[in-house]
Amino acid sequence: MLRDIPFFWRKRCWQSWVLLPLSLIFRALVLLRRQLYRLGVIASYRAPVPVIVVGNVTVGGNGKTPLVIALVNALQEKGWKVGVISRGYGGNRRKPVLVNEKSDVRTVGDEPLLIHQKTRAPVSVYYRRQRAIENLLMHFPETELIISDDGLQHYALQYDCALLAIAADFGLGNGFCLPAGALREPLPPFATIDAIITTGKMSTALPISAPQFVTTFKNDQFYRSNGERISIETLKENPLYVVTAIARPERFLNRLHALGISPVISKIFADHAMLHESMLTFAADGLILMTTKDQVKTQNWSAFWQEKIIVLSDELTIDEELISLILSCATRTRK
């Protein structure tokens, strides 16, 4: 079962019904907040360049970060100067921060650091999206388009294109809002969804009308921390241990099992949790399997442990029609 997702978020049962009154209060507060923005009682910000929001309507583990990375790389290949803004979950900062190769993951957060490492795009981190954008454009005025990592529920930011990321194996859960379900806001979402992107094919229809695209992993390659590729056969010659701190670790474990890999021990920590060498004493005789998101938190590990890190690629395929849709939205709204 999901470590960070209560089982009753998957389908309705007595636990979800007991919590439903709290969900109705949460739902009412969100709807009130929506209406205040819709009426202009609370002001919203429109950036001077197009903004593409990649977000979700359920809590955690929807594959946003690999999707953001794939979109940035695809847009860069077409010649666009792309910047990224992120709240930076797991980080600690009091003002907007630009991510660079030497950034401390404890300050900027694991996802922004990973996005920068995989794309080399400028990434500005702050919980107030307007200030994050202003900081980004002040240092990189040549930026032509901004991707917001998460932010569908950040109503203070106007957008030009909204992409909804959904995990095919979870969908929208039981359809209830927090805490009885996983929904972060009532359906339909406040944002006008321009496209839905799922990691794998959905088994049920979604109650949201928008073009749907399916992404898959490009490959199942494993790499050492220095980027050297390592074969599955070589992996299986060693004791293998999993260390991960992601929202839905069973998805990572299922990929490993599908490749015929059975770890001796799987140590699973809370999403965004920092990883330290002191946690690894059980794995001294083998190799440590982790995700790319986990690897960015090993920057201060000793050479002994760095040499044991093995990362499974999470690079996604991107439909060319999705890129065309994004650019169409961005250019249409800015004419």
UniProtKB/Swiss-Prot annotation:
InterPro entries: LpxK (IPR003758), P-loop_NTPase (IPR027417)
Gene Ontology MF terms: ATP binding; tetraacyldisaccharide 4'-kinase activity
SUPFAM superfamilies named in the record: P-loop containing nucleoside triphosphate hydrolases
Cellular component aspect of the GO annotation: plasma membrane
Keywords: ATP-binding, Kinase, Lipid A biosynthesis, Lipid biosynthesis, Lipid metabolism, Nucleotide-binding, Transferase
Known EC number: 2.7.1.130
One BP annotation, GO: lipopolysaccharide core region biosynthetic process
Binding positions (ATP): 58-65
Superkingdom of the organism of origin: Bacteria
Keyword S-adenosyl-L-methionine on entry: no
Pfam families, A to Z: LpxK
Reaction(s) catalysed (UniProt annotation): a lipid A disaccharide + ATP = a lipid IVA + ADP + H(+)
UniProt pathway: Glycolipid biosynthesis; lipid IV(A) biosynthesis; lipid IV(A) from (3R)-3-hydroxytetradecanoyl-[acyl-carrier-protein] and UDP-N-acetyl-alpha-D-glucosamine: step 6/6
HAMAP family in alphabetical order: LpxK (MF_00409)
Recorded family membership: Belongs to the LpxK family.
Described purpose of this protein according to its UniProt entry: Transfers the gamma-phosphate of ATP to the 4'-position of a tetraacyldisaccharide 1-phosphate intermediate (termed DS-1-P) to form tetraacyldisaccharide 1,4'-bis-phosphate (lipid IVA).
Annotated PANTHER family: TETRAACYLDISACCHARIDE 4'-KINASE, TETRAACYLDISACCHARIDE 4'-KINASE, MITOCHONDRIAL-RELATED
Protein name (record): Tetraacyldisaccharide 4'-kinase
